[in-house]
């Protein structure tokens, strides 16, 4: 009986050790976190519910910059290796044209308009010219087949940008790339409850990602988790030092117990 009990205890200790290794965040100094800590970030720019300023449009980013908000934005790579700011993998919801954005050239994308307005899908360079360091940026990398090219070309653009930029992604392989090649950028693991991952993620993978058990790949310094219940593993990673970022807030009340807030459809103060 004693041997059996000892074996159970040893097994539990080993499992706890493996879990702790898997979820442990990366290290970052207070100075590295400071530009992003305690800030509100306009989700895809300060877009409007009436559609006059579509998400991820130059108008939405200009409005956010004029107030001084941080912004969260999404980057994709086009068929001709241009870095554009757009959220969905498919163009249809925002442009009415079906097709994956990575299969279109920039010239083809320039023919499209966002949500029936005169706004085009912007280049990352155009967005950065609008923001010009007015507030910090959380830059979300969308997963794609050409992850390496997306990361390399985006970093080449960011090299001379004078403002504060951190990166995040649902794809831990992108964080792993940054950990290895561009460790100077603060890294964030995007996550949500396992049952909310789409068909592209198997149940085991969704479980691992939703519980941040993939942190060992990219060692994120912050976790951007969907507002709602957080699994024990996520709270443990936060207790180990990961910054707490929530998305997507639609209420002032969401600032409680968070270090930064990604928001939309209301106007908070600049700081938590």
Whereabouts are the PLM-identified features?
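Phosphate-group recognition and catalysis centered on beta-loop-alpha active-site segments
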Residues: 2-272
């Amino acid at each position: 009986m004693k041997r059996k009990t000892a074996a159970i205890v040893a097994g539990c200790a080993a499992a706890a050790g493996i879990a702790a290794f898997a979820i442990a965040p990366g290290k970052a100094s207070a100075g590295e976190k400071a530009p992003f800590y305690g800030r509100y970030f306009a989700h895809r720019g300060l877009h409007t519910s009436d559609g006059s300023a579509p998400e991820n449009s130059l108008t939405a980013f200009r409005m956010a910059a004029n107030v001084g908000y941080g912004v969260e934005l999404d980057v994709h790579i086009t068929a001709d290796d241009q870095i554009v700011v757009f959220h969905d993998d498919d163009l249809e919801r925002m442009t009415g044209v079906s097709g994956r954005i990575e299969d279109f050239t920039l010239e083809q994308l320039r023919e499209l308009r966002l949500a029936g307005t005169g706004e085009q899908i912007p280049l990352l360079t155009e967005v950065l010219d609008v923001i010009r360091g007015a507030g910090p940026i959380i830059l979300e990398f969308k997963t794609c087949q050409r992850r390496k090219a997306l990361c390399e070309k985006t970093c080449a653009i960011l090299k001379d940008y004078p403002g504060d930029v951190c990166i995040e992604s649902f794809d831990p392989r992108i964080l792993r790339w940054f950990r290895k090649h561009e460790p100077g950028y603060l890294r964030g693991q995007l996550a949500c409850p396992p049952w909310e991952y789409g068909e592209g993620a198997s149940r085991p993978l969704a479980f691992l990602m939703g519980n941040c058990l993939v942190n060992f790949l990219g060692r994120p310094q912050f976790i951007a988790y969907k507002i709602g219940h957080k699994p024990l593993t996520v709270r443990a990673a936060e207790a180990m030092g990961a910054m707490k970022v929530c998305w997507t807030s639609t209420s002032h009340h969401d600032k409680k117990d968070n270090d930064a807030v990604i928001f939309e459809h209301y106007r908070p103060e600049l700081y938590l």
